[in-house]
Amino acid sequence: ESLWSNVMLGHQGRRYRRGPWLRRKAARADTVDIIDSYDVRTPGSDIPALALSGGNQQKLIVGREMTAEPTLLIAAHPTRGVDVGAQAAIWEQLRIARGDGLGVLLISADLDELIGLSNRLLVIFRGALTADLDPSHVTPEDLGTYMAGRRQEQVA
């Protein structure tokens, strides 16, 4: 599928529908905005999404979800498998969105990502909350031990 049709995924019932018809022109315009705003490297919005690199696919997905103006974004491993440049771009967009008041639930195995993007870290091990941490006062090593089952003395 083309990039612009991918941008409509999950949003057909809202922004891109007028009665029984899809508003392709609106989807194409939003796709061009996402390409520009999120620095998606592509020759155009009509190419297949599979033709993009993994990093550019991730940036397109983040842009698509942000364009929907959510009140909560669940970002599960948003930078897994992407290059350093795409990772930095995605991190910056998440920081901007959080600064604008978007609630972001970040799920990641990348400890530096968790510490760098979070304003609060909650660690769950085997279904139980084991730690409630301030990312400005935790090291990746400490966070890793909580992820492996160590319990914080007082968990909120």
Show where each model-derived region lies.
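Glycine-rich phosphate-binding loops of nucleotide-dependent enzymes
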Residues: E1-A156
